[in-house]
């Protein structure tokens, strides 16, 4: 799929992701994989960091849901998004906006850095910051949990 630090447009991201999803599901079908037993972990449809036009939260959500609607079979029970180098705030807002759409799947998150970044920054390796870091992590986890039901 697209590498985030490039200059591709959101439309190029859509096209590349579409082709990739088609190949993935062709291979899953060819190998008789039960789609009811998978969780898809795709990227969101984003502009590259170096692209002069950065898509809005709403545009990212619309393009991502549209791409998935066309290329992901309804038998897939869930889609867990990677943050793909987005800021923790953008990853959460994009997920929230996508969950405003009616889809065939549960849309959730599988974030590493985007879930942990604020806690790690708050902690900064100092024992006296542990409680504040834990609170920052819980706050981010709650926000992403709310985003799975468009609750922000």
Model-derived segments and spans:
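Short, small-residue-biased leader/transition segments that mark boundaries at the very start
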Residues: 1-3
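Active-site capping/gating regions of soluble enzymes
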Residues: 8-152
